[in-house]
Amino acid sequence: MRISKTVLLGLVAAALAGPARAQKEIVVWHAYRGGEKAAFEKVVASYNASGAAKGAKVTTLAVPYDAFADKITAAVPRGKGPDVFIYAQDRLGGWIEAGNTIEPIDFFLDEATTGRFLPSTMEAMTYRGTVYGLPLNYKVITLIYNKKLLAAPPRTTAELVAAAKKLTDPAAGKYGLAYWYSDYYYHAALQNAFGGGVFTGGNKPALNRPENVQALELLVKWLERDRILPAEPSTALITSLFNQGKAAMVFSGPWFLGEIAGVDYGLALLPTVDEADGRPMRPWMTVEGVYVAAPSANKDAAYAFARYLTDLEAARVLALEGRQTPANQAIYADAAVAADPVLAAFRKQVEVALPMPNLPEMTMVWSPATTAMNTIVNKSATPKAALDLAQKEVVERIARLKGR
């Protein structure tokens, strides 16, 4: 059988070219559900269909939030995890110190990329001077109020207490203010207003610093003297009170809004604190970072997806369809986003927020701090005594963590 010259040349060229290059698969782990997941998957589909993918294909896996951090810790260092994962910055330092988990991305960064984000969100992605992730979305608590009970939100703590007292009737189960004040995360906004914090500038624990004691003394005043707060707060109780019109104001975040759809509510800045020389309440900000896994064999493609996920077009989808607050600062100039009162309120609140510490030692703080909060609100110890005990326990826990 004779083979034409054209066919023969084609066969030779194919042989020289070798086998077709396999499409790169970029596996991404996330913990989104509901509308957040739908918006995220829409961005992923857009990426896969675009020229930006350059032969790569992103596949996603939704991992339950409660199991997410442990799965990353167990799987990624052994090369059994994703190429990219999305999680808040509070575990960042621990994963970096553990090794072989998160790839530093300073090599990939340029001014155009770093300049797209709110500076505080980039700070959250930085550990010991090195950047390890691109900020995707942030979350903060703010003041949420029932418009039928309160014509205008308070701007100061003096105004807050005055308004809350008028709306409080413990016998009827009504309170001017309700929030999970016994939880250290929620309390941090008040603590930070006084200039307090968890660590010193040298990253040493300092839970019992005077400013932290002052913040707790103010909380005790609201609870015991002003009596504007419900006893034994819980997320279920606070949600129930607000939905029933029995709580006029709440300190909470975007996760709370889905639970109060039937209430005519407004959002406003957390008040300034008269007792702290008029400084603002400064909530902790959690930032969802997009991280490239250190063992990934496709780091270039993984970073390319991370960059796409945090660009302006993706931010618009995440904001308007996923109801998230993107770290990309340009999105807030978008007409539809700027006109959205919820997105605008959280954007305003983040201006005075502080990134939650991303040190590995932070994991040693939560339990002692929460115990201290409960001891104080249950009147079992003074703020100073409870914080002294928490400080001692945190120091001991950190020493064990570091093997000393």
Which stretches of residues belong to each language-model region?
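Glycine-centered hinge/linker elements that transmit conformational signals in sensory
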Residues: 163-164, 204-231
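Hinge/lid segment of periplasmic solute-binding proteins
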Residues: 89-140, 152, 157-163, 189, ...
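Conserved N-terminal structural module of periplasmic/extracytoplasmic solute-binding proteins
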Residues: 9-11, 22-99, 111-113, 274-278, ...
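Paired acidic/hydrophobic, glycine-rich loop segments that form the ligand-binding mouth/hinge
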Residues: 83-86, 248-253, 266
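Extracytoplasmic/periplasmic solute-binding protein
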Residues: 130-136, 141, 159-205, 220, ...
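A structural signal for short loop-to-beta-strand junctions that line the ligand-binding cleft
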Residues: 74, 82-83, 112-145, 175-176, ...
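C-terminal lobe and pocket-closing loops
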Residues: 254-266, 271-371, 402-403
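Short helix-initiation/N-cap motifs at beta->coil->alpha
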Residues: 62-71, 90, 157-159, 230-244
